[in-house]
């Protein structure tokens, strides 16, 4: 089996959402990133896009409080010109240690669950784990 390798050639912020009507309305494959607060989800997206500051990061848990959509462009490693293949990288709020009220955490949990249950375009969920902490 031959596997195609891809290079990410750019990323742009598209939208922040807390309900389905705020999601991008085009049909594009989505890859979601989920994990504990401050595990590095936003930092990973910045690294993949090779753009410091694309996704906002903080040393304080709970910086990401909405579902954030980023449009990424990719090309096959064997091709010189970027293919117009686009996917959304979806940065989800972290769970566990955000310094916020329980009601706010419950709201985050509700809109994350609705997104994951109802997105037609969600193709992959990447769970990030920090090996310094036991899974929740």
Task: Tell me what each language-model feature is.
Residues 97-104, 134-136:
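Conserved ATPase-coupling elements of RecA-like P-loop NTPase cores
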Residues 103-132:
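Inter-motif core of Ras-like GTPase G domains
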Residues 74, 132-135:
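Acidic pyrophosphate-coordinating catalytic loop
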Residues 1-99:
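Conserved G1/Walker A P-loop phosphate-binding module
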């Amino acid at each position: 089996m031959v596997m195609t390798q891809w290079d990410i050639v750019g990323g742009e912020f598209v939208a922040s959402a807390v309900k389905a009507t705020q999601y991008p309305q085009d049909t594009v494959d989505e890859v979601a990133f989920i994990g504990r607060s401050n595990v590095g989800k936003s930092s990973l997206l910045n690294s993949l896009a090779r753009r410091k500051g694309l996704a906002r990061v903080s040393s304080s848990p709970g910086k990401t409080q909405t579902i954030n959509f980023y449009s990424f462009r990719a090309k096959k490693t064997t091709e010189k010109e970027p293919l117009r293949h686009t996917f959304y990288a979806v940065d989800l709020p972290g769970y566990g240690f955000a310094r916020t009220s329980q009601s706010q955490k419950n709201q985050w949990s509700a809109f994350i669950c609705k997104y994951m249950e109802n997105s037609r375009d969600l193709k992959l969920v990447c769970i990030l784990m920090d090996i310094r902490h036991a899974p929740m």
